């Protein structure tokens, strides 16, 4: 049976794109945990407000003699602290895992410019003796082919193998940009004069889309990112063509 994955933005979408990496699995899980605590807190606070309004709306005298309540003050101090601890611990663990890059099998350097991306496969040397690199520009609307996505497809995609530890090194030639691929759980600033890194392990073959997520000028929306994850054999065949 085939399973359809949502790897692109959809109109009126209210949830995340489908996950393709363990990192994004963790982000979605943390989101669901935090949302659970938020719903519990909202329900509890709403119930308390309802009870207070109901009990004191017709009695204008009794609450005037409530000068303090030590037990109540302890409860409303400890309860938020406990909730914050339950949120903090998994978020700290996930933050560490997202930031740690251990022994990547392949490195891709993403260089942002106004308004396109340059990708360098520094681990591979082409037939000319230079590293494999290429520029990636948006496909104009009037040049789109059937099946291509407006404002998302590019003339040259990043191609990577699945089930391989990848490291993306991100930087910029001019202003601050941002390298973001939602389905991979990646969002990394591209800052001039600085190298930032982020890792990914793609678990399935597909085409993933992202965009520059930092306002970088008049054509900010014309800096899409398209990444195609393929099998090792297909990746090696693609690499031979470069």
UniProtKB/Swiss-Prot annotation:
Topology within the bilayer: Multi-pass membrane protein
Keyword annotations: Copper, Electron transport, Magnesium, Membrane, Metal-binding, Mitochondrion, Mitochondrion inner membrane, Respiratory chain, Translocase, Transmembrane, Transmembrane helix, Transport
Binding note for cofactor: Binds a dinuclear copper A center per subunit.
Matching InterPro entries: CcO_II (IPR045187), CcO_II-like_C (IPR002429), CcO_II_C (IPR034210), Copper_CuA (IPR001505), Cupredoxin (IPR008972), Cyt_c_oxidase_su2 (IPR014222), Cyt_c_oxidase_su2_TM_dom (IPR011759), Cyt_c_oxidase_su2_TM_sf (IPR036257)
Post-translational modification: The signal sequence of COX2 is processed by IMP1.
Localisation: Mitochondrion inner membrane
One of the record's GO cellular component terms: mitochondrial inner membrane
Positions with a binding annotation for Cu cation A2: 212, 214, 216, 220
Stretches that traverse the bilayer: 34-55, 74-98
Pfam family, one: COX2
Known EC number: 7.1.1.9
PROSITE patterns, per the entry: COX2, COX2_CUA, COX2_TM
Binding residue positions for Mg(2+): 214
Mitochondrial matrix topological segments: 56-73
A GO biological-process term: ATP synthesis coupled electron transport
Gene Ontology MF term list: copper ion binding; cytochrome-c oxidase activity
The UniProt record lists the keyword Mitochondrion: yes
Protein role: Component of the cytochrome c oxidase, the last enzyme in the mitochondrial electron transport chain which drives oxidative phosphorylation. The respiratory chain contains 3 multisubunit complexes succinate dehydrogenase (complex II, CII), ubiquinol-cytochrome c oxidoreductase (cytochrome b-c1 complex, complex III, CIII) and cytochrome c oxidase (complex IV, CIV), that cooperate to transfer electrons derived from NADH and succinate to molecular oxygen, creating an electrochemical gradient over the inner membrane that drives transmembrane transport and the ATP synthase.
NCBIfam families on file: CoxB
Family under the similarity heading: Belongs to the cytochrome c oxidase subunit 2 family.
Protein name: Cytochrome c oxidase subunit 2
Organism of provenance: Yarrowia lipolytica (strain CLIB 122 / E 150)
